[in-house]
Every structure is written in structure tokens, then in C-alpha cells.
């Protein structure tokens, strides 16, 4: 939908990717309505198979993506591939609780949310395991975001 596009400074050149044409159209409408001249493109593309050359970007930002793609590791591999050495990968995602009543609620919701393509029980270990197996990725920040800590910000640097 391009919801995050206006949050970047106008000096930041942006390319947006989505597999959904209706979501891309909403982003195009937002770009036009808010005169976001720094958005260089909005492209229909699969996050697990990006058509960009290796090391194309200084930073890849993937908000609310990993819980909706079929293969989060393939998506993370693609993000790492298109980011230049020294560049960053920035994720914002809901990370499920690992224990307690919230974990039980998320597991229940997960059984019903799967048809929507969303996994409320998405565990951190999917990202953590990926980072551990990648010698070229370093986790530089991980923190819960307000409100209520429902989302987690993770920043990684590609060596």
C-alpha cells in the first residue's frame, strides 16, 4: 500500500515491490497524492525471487513481509543478495510470543489466519536461525515497538 513511503526523507531514493497489483496501485495513488518524487519505481515482483542485480541497494526495508511469504528464509536470502556489502536489512514484523497465554492465543489465531496468509504465531527463531547460518549477516538491533510491543524491529548489516 506504500504506507511507509512518506516516512522516508525526500533524499532517500525508493523502489517498492509487491506481488499484489491492487496493493501496488494503492502505493501509486499514495505516491501521486503525496507528491513523493523520491519513489523511483513500484514494481510487481516476488520477494522470494527479486529481479534486481546482486548488491543493488544500500538498504532493503521489508515491513510486515515475513509473516505473509511462503518461505521466509528464501525472502531473507533475496534481501541479503540485493543489499550491498555494508548495507542494511530492516524488518518490522509481528513476532509471536514463545510462551504463556499470548502464545496460546496466537497459536489458536494461527490456525484460522492461515487462510489469510498471516501467521500470528511467527517465531523469532525463523529470523534468528537464518542469521546464525549466514556468515555475512550481523544482527545490529532487535527491539519491540509500541504500541504494546506487538511488532519487532530487526536491523541487520551485510558484511
Predicted segment positions?
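Short glycine-centered segments of the SAM/dcSAM-binding site in methyltransferase folds
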Residues: 13, 86-88
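A short glycine-rich, Lys/Arg-flanked "PGG" loop and its adjoining helix->strand segment in the class I
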Residues: 73-85
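Class I SAM-dependent methyltransferase SAM/SAH-binding core
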Residues: 1-49
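C-terminal lobe and adjacent flexible extensions of AdoMet/dcAdoMet transferase-like proteins
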Residues: 153-159
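C-terminal alpha-helical "lid/dimerization" subdomain adjacent to the S-adenosyl-L-methionine
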Residues: 92-152
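A short SAM/SAH-binding and catalytic strip from SAM-dependent methyltransferases
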Residues: 59-71
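A short acidic, Gly/Pro-enriched loop at the edge of an enzyme's catalytic core
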Residues: 45-59
Amino acid at each position: 500500500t506504500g504506507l511507509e513511503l512518506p516516512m522516508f526523507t525526500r533524499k532517500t531514493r525508493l523502489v517498492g515491490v509487491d506481488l499484489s497489483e491492487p496493493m501496488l496501485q494503492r502505493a501509486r495513488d499514495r505516491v501521486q497524492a503525496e507528491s513523493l518524487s523520491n519513489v523511483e519505481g513500484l514494481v510487481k515482483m516476488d520477494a522470494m525471487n527479486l529481479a534486481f542485480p546482486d548488491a543493488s541497494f544500500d538498504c532493503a526495508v521489508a515491513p510486515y513481509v515475513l509473516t505473509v511469504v511462503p518461505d521466509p528464509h528464501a525472502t531473507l536470502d533475496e534481501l541479503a543478495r540485493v543489499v550491498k556489502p555494508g548495507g542494511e536489512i530492516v524488518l518490522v514484523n509481528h513476532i509471536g510470543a514463545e510462551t504463556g497465554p499470548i502464545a496460546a492465543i496466537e497459536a489458536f489465531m494461527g490456525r484460522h489466519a492461515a487462510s489469510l496468509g498471516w501467521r500470528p504465531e511467527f517465531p523469532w527463531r525463523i529470523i534468528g536461525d537464518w542469521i546464525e547460518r549466514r556468515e555475512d549477516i550481523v544482527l545490529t538491533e532487535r527491539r519491540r515497538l509500541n504500541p504494546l510491543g506487538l511488532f519487532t524491529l530487526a536491523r541487520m548489516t551485510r558484511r
